[in-house]
Every structure is written in structure tokens, then in C-alpha cells.
Amino acid sequence: MHRALIVVDVQNDFCEGGSLAVTGGADVAAAITDLVGQTAGTSYRHVVATRDHHVDPGEHFAPAGEEPDYVSSWPVHCVAGTEGVGFHPNFAPAVASGAIDAVFDKGAYSAAYSGFEGLDENGETLAEWLRSRDVTEVDVVGIATDHCVRATALDAAREGFRTHVLLDLTAGVAEETTDRALEELRTAGVRLTGKPVVA
């Protein structure tokens, strides 16, 4: 019975300067790298990362010339082969260190918010990967608190993992949606500690 850290979508397009930037994302990326450096292999048996990785996600992107509604349609972001899809430079030391055991890409041809919708390079889901390594407890960090962190943590709990969100290591898009997400997570039995960065 082991514990894993799930790092959600710490990517260029979700940090300052990106096409769907979340204020505080770059600082959160650096803080997550510090956590990974201090705890990989000790507090956490495994560290995994998720990544938005869009090829042609259909209506997930707002049509050219139209404003996205920021609920079901979004600006173009994290397109495969672009700089925006890459992990943020502040997270690069964690990746370069070899501490990230697997990366789960999601959303190639449709909208995907939860890391549990993604697949690793071998086509394995996050739930399968964690179970095959006897992981029973997960801590979730990353971007954005009110979207992909929320969805990943809810799915982790639904999949039967004891789930904890380290809110100090998350960045939310807006206060209202973040508050709503936190209430939803509490109701689902997800343990929450700290306070998210919110613009």
C-alpha cells in the first residue's frame, strides 16, 4: 500500500504568458518542483504528471473568431507539437531529475479534464497504472484548482483512492469557481489542506 503524487497540467499554456494562463501558475510550478525534490522516493513511492495534449479536440476549442464561454469552449491551448503543451520551465528540474515515473496525456480528440481520462505512452490509464503498483493513496497538486485538479481529485476518489489535495500547490482561475470546486471536493470526501492561489 503506497502513496503517489499526481501533478496536474503544469504546462506553459496554463502559466503566465500562455494562451490560457492561470495567475500564479509559474510559482506553483516552482513550488511543486521543490516538493518533488524533497519527497520523491520517500513520502511518495511514485510521482506522475498529467498533461493536456490536444490534437483536434473538436468543440473544446472555440471556433475561430468566436469568444470561448470558458465552460465548455476554450481558447486554443496545449496543442501537440507546440511550445504551449510543454511542461513549464519551473517544473523542468523535476522532469529532468527522473523523478516523474509516468506522464498521462489527455484530450487528444475531445475535451478531457481529469488525469484519469489520460493514457501513458504504453496506453495504460492512470487508475490501472496506480493499482498495478499498489498505490492506495494520492496527493493531487497543479493547475487549475477549479478545473483539471478538481476533476482529477474527484475521479481519484471515485476510483477508490484516498485522495488529498495540497491546495497551497494549486492555482485557481477564479474565486467563485474555486470555492465551488472545493465544496464539491469536500462533499466527495477529498481531504483538503492549505489555500489555493487565486487571482
Located regions from the model:
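Extreme N-terminal starter segment of soluble prokaryotic enzymes
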Residues: 1-5
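Active-site flanking residues adjacent to catalytic metal/cofactor-binding acidic residues
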Residues: 8, 51, 167
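Short, glycine/acidic-enriched loop or turn micro-motifs at the edges of active sites
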Residues: 12, 55, 171
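Short glycine-enriched, charge-decorated loop/helix-capping segments at active-site entrances
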Residues: 18-25, 117-119
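Active-site alpha/beta core segments
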Residues: 30-137
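Histidine-anchored nucleotide/phosphate-binding helix
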Residues: 39, 147-158
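A short glycine-rich beta-strand->turn/loop micro-motif centered on a GG-aromatic cluster
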Residues: 139-142, 161-175
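Short acidic-hydrophobic, aromatic-tinged amphipathic segments that line or gate anion-handling sites
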Residues: 191-199
